[in-house]
Amino acid sequence: KLNCFKNGKDEAIGISDEIEKTLKKKYSFNNIAILVRAIFQTREFEERFLKIGLPYRILGGTKFYERAEIKDCIAYLRLIHQSKDDLAFDRIVNNPKRSIGESSIKLIHEFSKENSVSLEIASKQLIEQNLIKPKTKIGLSSFLFLMNKWRNDIKIKKTNHVKLLQLVLDESGYSAMLKNKKDIENENRLENIKELLSAMKEFDGLEPFLEHVALATSVDQDWDGEK
């Protein structure tokens, strides 16, 4: 049986409908598989299966929102949206490399804890009080400057959330980092990021998109292939 669909979303809906029909014929999940040409193409299927509560697992790969480059992008967006998001700060403060070593990150954490402030505020105060190494100060100051710039882009300039991520990828050096090392793995990462940008277009703004990601990554699926 050959079916044609006009886009990935329609394809995911059509195939999920076929899966549900197949399951009603007493087949188990172990009898069903979806083959994709490229790993980024799983995203539409994952979104659909989460929406209808259909359990799944990915063989030979990682779920879309758990891929390192996607988590990096989401961390940037989360920190732009909420400056007190310490988990996001930790993930991206030296990603790409900004000469902010482990000892400096440890210092930021200690200062944050001692003064009951976020990691971002701790970083600003360490710079202001000249308590951080000169080389680290340059990288950290640049990072904080960009964070402030991106917040102004979305709040004052009203830059839409899709364009915002494109700016982040370009201005942070993240895209260049992936493009400069030309191999299959980084090509796949760039394709995954393109798919993320496409997914973001389905939402009205940054906040609803981040809420969707939080929901998608919080779902704990119990897999039982015999059901």
Feature annotation, model-predicted:
Residues 1, 51-54, 62-96:
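Conserved short internal alpha-helix adjacent to the catalytic or cofactor-binding core
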Residues 106-111:
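C-terminal helical "lid" of AAA+/P-loop NTPase domains
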Residues 112-125:
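A short beta-strand-loop micro-motif that forms or neighbors metal/cofactor-
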Residues 1-55, 78-82, 114, 153-158:
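Helicase P-loop NTPase motor core
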Residues 28, 96, 125-227:
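Accessory C-terminal helicase-associated subdomains
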Residues 4, 8-11, 15-18, 38-41, ...:
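Helical mechanochemical/support elements of P-loop NTPase systems and associated helical scaffolds
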